[in-house]
Amino acid sequence: MSDIALTVSVLALVAVVGLWIGNIKVRGVGFGIGGVLFGGIIVGHFVDQAGVTLSGDMLHFIQEFGLILFVYTIGIQVGPGFFASLRVSGLRLNLFAVLIVIMGGLVTAILHKIFAIPLPVVLGIFSGAVTNTPALGAGQQILRDLGTPVDLVDQMGMSYAMAYPFGICGILLTMWLMRLIFRVNVEAEAQKHESSLANGHSLIQTMNIRVENPNLNNMAIQDVPILNSDKIICSRLKRDDTLMVPSPGTIIQAGDLLHLVGQSTDLHNAQLVIGKEVDTSLSTRGTDLRVERVVVTNEKVLGKRIRDLHFKERYDVVISRLNRAGVELVASSDASLQFGDILNLVGRPASIDAVANVVGNAQQKLQQVQMLPVFIGIGLGVLLGSIPLFVPGFPVALKLGLAGGPLIMALILGRIGSIGKLYWFMPPSANLALRELGIVLFLAVVGLKSGGDFVDTLTQGEGLSWIGYGIFITAIPLITIGLLARIFAKMNYLTLCGMLAGSMTDPPALAFANNLHATSGAAALSYATVYPLVMFLRIITPQLLAVIFWGMG
């Protein structure tokens, strides 16, 4: 059998064994995709014992390409929500998550200096303790750039494997500890979260208002400042028994009922100006109007602003809402359309069908992947990661590397959405498949390289010490910031659990947090809020630590 065929066969065996290990769960918690690392260690041990030689160049390529695929697809997935998560609404959650990352780095630095832990080993422990595989890849990349011998770089994977199990267990224990210390009633916390959402300013809501302000009588909608802003959409107007789709030039009369869409604060301000909120239904049922959701798939409208498409003037159709990457937005006239945007349309059936044809509404396109943008994005990401950043006092130039470059490029492209006929939208199923393939390839190679010496290191070497260091790196930041967030910020327990899981970019921990309450989405929401920024910081942190420690000698 050729070296290539043998290497591929062994990698396939690693994937099978590792995924089987990952599917083993104890009380609903397992290693998940991280099981591939341990599958690689097991197979690698026996490969080493048998004296089998695999293709080193091929393993290196597969490891790096797997990492690139993984971080790129993560960036495309979270890109649309990354910059939004940095805004005020998620500022507090991101602040606490960033503190966890910083404190983890500080604990790592202290352990490195006090116990003189070799740099590759301590970076591996850090990556495993925070259960972040891209951090492992980024650390190995910067160590190679610094000229670290290959056998020492491979120690990073071994120490990562030592610290990884408690990294997963530690966050679950922290959630349990917070619940015990503060005697949390999960049902009450879920109800508080739902109440806060209902009273919050971030959700898109609706309000029906009767026009009672005499100053607005016989005025056009476009002449009423509160209705002519991009903060509120007037999607329906009912006069007597007639329901219509209003245009900017529609004349308002006393007694008209307006159906407004916007954030709660803006709706309240509009109600103070216009008149009184009423419970009267403005449903399209039984009328010649209907409400329908269509998806943007036509390349010709990508990047165009809603106002430039003139849907109201041409088709008498109003866009009441815009859903982008799962986030409901007010369909302001300045909003540019991106591939995969979901538009909420109000109008007559024939008119809605006409608008649907303009924007595409081809559901099958959502299941197709444009491969050209994928490779353009990966290529640009690799180029970005290769740009040297010279910092005074450092022995080598700092680079984003093969982990940071594709991630940042994917975040940017995911946020842009499309350029001309090129769009970076990727169907969730395709994104997940590429992401899982990438991480399986990466972890399989890391495990294979670590397997030969793993048992000896654990039983005769410093393996137990590495596990102890990992416990400190995992537990100290989580417990400290968890207590601060609960005591001083009065953070909701379910939100706190999601934030802790997000700060470790740990899907098993998110699954555990979601299972705390069957119907509440609090944990998932906070996880998604902090995940993009934390993932970026987790990849950058080991590179910064490596360069700083290397410079300090």
UniProtKB/Swiss-Prot annotation:
UniProt-listed PROSITE patterns: RCK_C (PS51202)
Domain of life: Bacteria
Disulfide topology: none
UniProt membrane topology term: Multi-pass membrane protein
Annotated keywords: Cell membrane, Membrane, Repeat, Transmembrane, Transmembrane helix, Transport
Transmembrane segments: 4-24, 28-48, 65-85, 95-115, 158-178, 371-391, 393-413, 437-457, 464-484, 493-513, 533-553
Pfam families per UniProt: Asp-Al_Ex, TrkA_C
A single BP term in Gene Ontology: potassium ion transport
Localization, UniProt: Cell membrane
Residue ranges constituting the RCK C-terminal domain according to the UniProt record: 192-276, 279-361
One of the record's GO molecular function terms: monoatomic cation transmembrane transporter activity
Gene Ontology cellular-component annotations: plasma membrane
Family as reported in the entry's similarity comment: Belongs to the AAE transporter (TC 2.A.81) family. YidE subfamily.
Xref: HAMAP family: YidE (MF_01016)
Protein name: Putative transport protein YidE
Originating species: Salmonella paratyphi C (strain RKS4594)
Lineage: Bacteria, Pseudomonadati, Pseudomonadota, Gammaproteobacteria, Enterobacterales
Gene name of the encoded protein: yidE
